[in-house]
Amino acid sequence: MEKYYLAVDIGASSGRHILGHMENGKIELEEIYRFENGMDHKDGKLLWDVNRLFGEIVAGMKKCKKLGKIPVSMAIDTWAVDYVLLDEKDQILGDTYGYRDHRTDGMDAEVAKILPETELYGKTGIQKQIFNTVYQLMAVKQQTPELLQ
């Protein structure tokens, strides 16, 4: 019986499910499912619809089942700087902002008051970009601190 491995790649404008397996000693890859992706404009904010994204992940998995190619494992890769805050019951807290939202404007200066840029870079090794998670978290701390309680 073939062993299949599923990779779900979710980018800013599209997502896809790639199924891999070994055939004659070589890795064979097949795109199983593809979907459009993007942030929604809501009340002047750029937000991800995580419920829709979850539905797309499930739809791709159902396509694998329909094809009779059930993966033994799967991995999901996303855009890396966005996140979802959860409460103690694993419920989403607040909006799920996209990295292109402007709420982080000026947050680099706020973070620098606590941790100088050179020190931040030394600790993280990450190039300074205003959409980095550290600036998003500072925006939460300043704009909606109740979410961090």
Model-predicted regions and their roles:
Residues 1-94, 122:
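N-terminal glycine/serine-rich phosphate-binding loop of ATP-dependent small-molecule kinases
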Residues 59-149:
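Glycine-rich phosphate-binding/catalytic subdomain of phosphoryl-transfer
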